[in-house]
Amino acid sequence: MATPDVSVHMEEVVVVTTPDTAVDGSGVEGVKTVLVTTNLAPHGGDLTEDNMETENAAAAAAAAFTASSQLKEAVLVKMAEEGENLEAEIVYPITCGDSRANLIWRKFVCPGINVKCVQYDEHVISPKEFVHLAGKSTLKDWKRAIRMNGIMLRKIMDSGELDFYQHDKVCSNTCRSTKIDLSGARVSLSSPTSAEYIPLTPAAADVNGSPATITIETCEDPGDWTAAIGDDTFTFWRGLKDAGLLDEVIQEFHQELVETMRGLQQRVQDPPLQLRDAVLLNNIVQNFGMLDLVKKVLASHKCQMDRSREQYARDLAALEQQCDEHRRRAKELKHKSQHLSNVLMTLTPVSLPPPVKRPRLARATSGPAAMASQVLTQSAQLALGPGVPVPQLTSVPLGKVVSTLPSTVLGKGSLQAPPASSPASPLLGGYTVLASSGSTYPSTVEIHPDASSLTVLSTAAVQDGSTVFKVVSPLQLLTLPGLGPTLQNVAQASPGSSTIVTVPAGAAPGPEEHTATIEVAAMAEDHERK
């Protein structure tokens, strides 16, 4: 379906000069008002470019404004005054949805999307901001969202009726269109002839405002291609098909596109991206409607990145959990180690210095408990406390040597008797009990008198070296073979016919009576001599 022709009826542009008014308090530049009238029919009093001058511009414009009864629209044009020079500023009324604004053409430079050239509520904003404020930001192309007299701005610009300001001098190379204009009616409105007079009519139109027909052929989306071309365009391509050249043209197109994309792919491998490559990509995306493919690639990459981020987050959480577990186990092991160290410290015996023994007087010790406790402390030698009564020697086994001498003295062999008056004599007031004749310890200890009350009997009975006795007045302690059945108060009998005997005081010479006690200091094991 061909697009119907768009007929634009225009009139001459008349500049109206008004008294200078300051924009702000400083009064740097003046603002003048220009009325541009657009009528459906010409009016009387035609004005030409040759006879229009600055002096009669106001009167001519006023006459044209008052004489026209079919005035449809007035376009406000501002003129800036700097010194004596006057420069006209064209303002086009534009709409976007329900919002209305003015497009300042002198500021409308290429590419125009982010250039502040739209006057909206006393503010100068960019077309992109104007589209967002109008609520049309969902549209892909801002030129389709903005309209002039109900016609999309893209169609007007593609037809050549409107172009960027000084586009032949200032171009960003991102505005080139691949549309084919077969009608030849490409007219630019961007070349004013003078500072006071700006023609708004096409080149084919007369100066009196006669209507001119302009065919606008454009397309935006691939879905609109079949319905957006004109009959002439369709006839052109059908002629190529009938001539058999369409296949060759398509093949050339394909080869050119392949080579272009191959070169583009090779160039984008080396950073940075060149400007011409960015322009090429932008044109391909816009003209072939591939913006959805770009969005699809971005969405896929974003989804992949989100999955990777979630996986990394899970792995990090697992590692943090393992670290916490290891820290907890380390704390437990440290606590157990400290506890074991404390237990070992409590179990370790503390070496204390041995207490200093003070010399004391001999005291009788009753009961065999002391002897038994001393017997258990040493296996080879047994040290017993002094003052043990003779009847309590029953707990002392035979075959041992009992003496009041220290063990260090007994280990030296024969003993030397200290002086009888020595106060430190270990035999003073004590007894020495030796083994019987059946013992293997003959002549272990010699008997020495150490006090006036100690009497040594005749040694004639002990010449064999196996019998030793000690006499202390008024008691006598005998260890003689074969005397056990004849002595009184038998305390203990041995299988070898040896007897430890206590004799009462009445049976021994001496005036005094004493309790018979024996001080036992050390004992030696029987098997050490074997």
Swiss-Prot record:
Xref: SUPFAM superfamilies: SAND domain-like
Gene3D superfamilies on file: SAND domain-like
Species this chain originates from: Homo sapiens
Record keyword Coiled coil present: yes
Binding site for DNA: 136, 140, 143, 154
InterPro entries: SAND-like_dom_sf, SAND_dom
Placement of covalent cross-link Glycyl lysine isopeptide (Lys-Gly) (interchain with G-Cter in SUMO1): 155
Intracellular or extracellular location(s): Nucleus; Cytoplasm
Keyword set includes Transport: no
GO molecular function: DNA-binding transcription factor activity, RNA polymerase II-specific; identical protein binding; metal ion binding; RNA polymerase II cis-regulatory region sequence-specific DNA binding; sequence-specific double-stranded DNA binding
Purpose of the protein: Trans-acting factor that binds to glucocorticoid modulatory elements (GME) present in the TAT (tyrosine aminotransferase) promoter and increases sensitivity to low concentrations of glucocorticoids. Also binds to the transferrin receptor promoter. Essential auxiliary factor for the replication of parvoviruses.
PANTHER family listed in its UniProt record: GLUCOCORTICOID MODULATORY ELEMENT-BINDING PROTEIN (PTHR10417), GLUCOCORTICOID MODULATORY ELEMENT-BINDING PROTEIN 2 (PTHR10417:SF2)
Top-level lineage group: Eukaryota
Domain SAND, chain residue ranges per copy: 81-163
UniProt name for this protein: Glucocorticoid modulatory element-binding protein 2
Sites of the Glycyl lysine isopeptide (Lys-Gly) (interchain with G-Cter in SUMO2) crosslink: 155
Coiled coil, from the record: 304-348
GN (gene name): GMEB2
Record's subunit section: Homodimer, and heterodimer of GMEB1 and GMEB2. GMEB1 and GMEB2 form the parvovirus initiator complex (PIF). Interacts with the glucocorticoid receptor (NR3C1). May interact with CREB-binding protein (CBP).
GO cellular component: chromatin; cytosol; nucleoplasm; nucleus
UniProt cross-references to SMART domains, sorted A to Z: SAND (SM00258)
Keywords (A to Z) from UniProt: Coiled coil, Cytoplasm, DNA-binding, Isopeptide bond, Metal-binding, Nucleus, Phosphoprotein, Transcription, Transcription regulation, Ubl conjugation, Zinc
Modified residues (Phosphoserine): 373
Free-text tissue specificity from the UniProt record: Expressed in peripheral blood lymphocytes and fetal liver. Expressed preferentially in reproductive and/or developmentally important cells, such as testis, placenta, bone marrow and fetal tissues.
GO term, biological process aspect, one: regulation of transcription by RNA polymerase II
Binding-site residues, Zn(2+): 110, 167, 171, 175
